[in-house]
From Swiss-Prot:
Its EC number is 3.5.1.5. Pfam families: Urease_beta (PF00699). It comes from Geobacillus kaustophilus (strain HTA426). Pathway: Nitrogen metabolism; urea degradation; CO(2) and NH(3) from urea (urease route): step 1/1. Keywords: Cytoplasm, Hydrolase. GO terms for cellular component: urease complex. This is Urease subunit beta. InterPro entries: Urease_beta-like, Urease_betasu_sf, Urease_subunit. It is found in: Cytoplasm.
Length: 111
């Protein structure tokens, strides 16, 4: 290997291959654009985004890390969501979960 050299695989790299994806249509009912990052708990996004929130619980956008999807006012987009992995704990964001996503009988949602 030469210093600075890199080698790429010949086959494409597919992220989240083993995860089941959920497709949802999202409409921005607000008057300002809304941008959602790759690892944001989609259930907790801006309340002006209209979609099936229960179907989005425990999931994030299936896009490359560090990227985002922008929803312009009045626009409808189809997005693909995949479940969080690892310990499946969500903290902060819009304070709707703040803890484990599974196993508390309420789906993790705070009242």
């Amino acid at each position: 290997m030469i210093p600075g050299e890199y080698r790429l695989r010949e086959e494409p790299i597919v992220c989240n291959r083993q995860k089941s994806a959920t497709k949802l249509t999202v409409v921005n009912r607000g008057d300002r654009p809304v941008q959602v990052g790759s690892h944001f708990h989609f259930f907790e996004v801006n309340s002006f985004l209209e979609f099936d929130r229960q179907a989005a619980y425990g999931k994030h956008l299936n896009i490359p890390a560090g990227t985002a999807v922008r929803f312009e006012p009045g626009d409808a987009k189809q997005v693909e969501l995949v479940p969080f992995s690892g310990e499946r704990r969500v903290y902060g964001l819009n304070n709707m979960v703040n803890g484990p996503l599974d196993g508390n009988g309420k789906g993790g949602v705070r009242e």
